């Protein structure tokens, strides 16, 4: 596995052979409803922005005009700017002894008969976001913590436990406009996952960090908690579970807690490869959700209006560029991008 890819020129993806992880659908934008026309064009080309990684995750656009993303097995955060990918941070996830004991095993989604197939422990960081001051927030996954990167580069651990019990693997993370940080904790940061003897919190949970205090918002209600996103008005929190392939919507109370969770849209009937993982929302409230067949675009009313199918199964995504109209898609070994009509939020 290469932990530092050779930067490649951006190329448009046309008809190509898909990986085993890709959808049965062809690469492109697929319309299910005319509402898609005002969101993204079916003629929008999907481009390769960078490639040669192990398992990319957590894309986030920074105010400095560049994209950051993680390569989990490489334990690296990369910076993508002007078509070039470079190392931004080493040891972004687990950064201690006995590294071989950490990180659940995964692979790069090639078929096992393919000579490019690789298995590896997921020792690096996972989700990334920015706080209201523009500082990088990291769900360190195998590092079992939420970390903030200060302006001088110092790492500040904001949270690594709940009531004295260590997290198992913070997965994805978002920031509310009041500065509070919402994140999911999973078993994926540990080698044996839920059966690992180092598990201290025997459930997947949704937490909120605010001014140094960690509050448990949800546990056991939804298995395999993973991706999350707020609606533009922050009245709702959307939440999915990895492998569960459905999304719930929760009302956000004035105090920041959540209530009245309901099924918002269900992807379980679709048998194409792909799972619910990363999620983003645009300024009109449309939800972009990874799932079977690619990235599902769902209206604020819960209607599936179209799917973006990149060459590889998408894991997470982010809006970027100056106008926030480029959707960056993190897959196993590459970062793809496509232009959309509505800016991200």
Predicted regions and their residues:
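Bacterial N-terminal signal peptides that target proteins for export
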Residues: 2-11
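Sequence-structural signature of mature extracellular/luminal beta-sheet repeat domains
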Residues: 25-345
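Bacterial N-terminal signal peptides
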Residues: 10-21
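Intrinsic low-complexity/disordered segments
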Residues: 1-2, 22
């Amino acid at each position: 596995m290469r932990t530092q890819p050779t930067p490649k020129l951006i190329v448009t993806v046309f008809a190509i052979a898909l990986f085993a992880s890709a959808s049965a659908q062809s690469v492109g934008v697929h319309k299910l409803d005319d509402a898609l026309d005002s969101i993204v064009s079916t003629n929008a080309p999907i481009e390769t922005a960078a490639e040669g990684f192990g398992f990319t995750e957590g894309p986030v656009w920074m105010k400095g005009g560049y994209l950051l993303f993680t390569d989990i097995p490489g334990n690296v955060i990369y910076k993508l700017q002007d078509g070039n990918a470079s190392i931004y941070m080493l040891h972004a996830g687990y950064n201690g002894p006995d590294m071989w004991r950490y990180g659940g095993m995964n692979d790069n989604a090639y078929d096992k008969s393919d000579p490019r197939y690789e298995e590896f422990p997921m020792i690096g960081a996972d989700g990334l976001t920015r706080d209201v001051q523009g500082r990088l927030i990291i769900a360190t996954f195998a590092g079992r913590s939420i970390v903030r990167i200060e302006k001088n580069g110092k790492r500040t651990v904001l949270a690594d436990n709940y009531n004295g019990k260590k997290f198992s693997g913070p997965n994805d993370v978002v920031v509310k406009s009041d500065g509070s940080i919402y994140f999911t904790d999973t078993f994926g940061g540990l080698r044996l996952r839920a059966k690992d003897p180092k598990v201290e919190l025997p459930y997947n949970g949704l937490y909120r960090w605010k001014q140094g205090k960690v509050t448990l918002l949800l546990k056991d209600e939804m298995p395999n908690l993973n991706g999350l996103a707020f609606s533009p008005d922050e009245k709702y929190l959307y939440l999915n579970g990895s492998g569960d392939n459905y999304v719930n919507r929760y009302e956000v109370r004035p105090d920041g807690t959540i209530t009245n969770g309901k099924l918002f849209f269900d992807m379980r009937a679709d048998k194409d490869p792909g799972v619910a993982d990363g999620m983003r929302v645009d300024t009109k409230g449309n939800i972009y959700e990874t799932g079977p067949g690619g990235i599902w675009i769902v209206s604020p009313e819960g209607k599936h209006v179209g799917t973006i199918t990149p060459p590889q199964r998408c894991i997470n995504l982010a809006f970027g560029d100056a106008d926030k109209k480029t959707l960056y898609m993190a897959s196993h070994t590459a970062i793809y991008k496509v232009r959309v009509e509505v800016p991200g939020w």
